[in-house]
Curated annotation (Swiss-Prot):
Pathway: tRNA modification; tRNA-queuosine biosynthesis
Protein name per its UniProtKB record: NADPH-dependent 7-cyano-7-deazaguanine reductase
GO molecular function terms listed in the Swiss-Prot or TrEMBL record: preQ1 synthase activity
Catalytic function, reaction form: 7-aminomethyl-7-carbaguanine + 2 NADP(+) = 7-cyano-7-deazaguanine + 2 NADPH + 3 H(+)
Length: 129
C-alpha cells in the first residue's frame, strides 16, 4: 500500500454484517486550502457509520484525508465530498461526517452531512435503569 496521499479508498468485508454496530473515527489533523485566500484550513473530522457489507480500511482513509491538503474548497463542499466518496466505497446502512473547522476570522464552522440507506432504521434505543 502506498504512503502517498490518494483518493483511493480500500474496503474489507464487514466481519459481522448481521449486526448493526457503530464505528466512530476521529481525524484531528485534516487540512485543506481556503478557495478564496489559498491559506490552510484545519479541521477535526468525525466519521460515524453503521456498516453494511463493507468497512473502510484505516490506512487508505488516512491517505484519502491527506489528499485534501492541496485542494481548495469551501467547508460545505469538502464535507459533502468526503461523505459521497465514503458512501460510494462502503455503501453503509448509515453514515455521518462532522467537520469541525478551526477558527478563521473569528468564526468556527461545523458542517454535518448524513446518509441513510433506503429502508434502514436504527433499532429502538434501550434505556437501562
Amino acid at each position: 500500500m502506498s504512503t502517498q496521499p490518494s483518493k483511493d479508498l480500500e474496503t474489507f468485508p464487514n466481519p459481522r454484517p448481521e449486526r448493526d454496530f457503530v464505528l466512530h473515527m476521529r481525524i484531528p489533523e485534516f487540512t485543506c486550502l481556503c478557495p478564496k485566500t489559498g491559506q490552510p484550513d484545519f479541521a477535526t473530522i468525525h466519521l460515524d457509520y453503521v456498516p453494511d457489507e463493507r468497512c473502510v480500511e484505516l490506512k487508505s482513509l488516512k491517505l484519502y484525508m491527506w489528499s485534501f491538503r492541496d485542494q481548495g474548497a469551501f467547508h460545505e463542499a469538502i464535507t459533502n465530498e468526503i461523505l459521497d466518496d465514503l458512501v460510494r466505497a462502503t455503501e453503509p446502512r448509515y453514515m455521518k461526517v462532522t467537520a469541525e473547522f478551526y477558527v478563521r476570522g473569528g468564526i468556527y464552522t461545523t458542517v454535518v452531512a448524513e446518509h441513510r440507506k433506503p429502508g434502514w432504521a436504527p433499532a429502538p434505543k434501550v434505556e437501562l435503569a
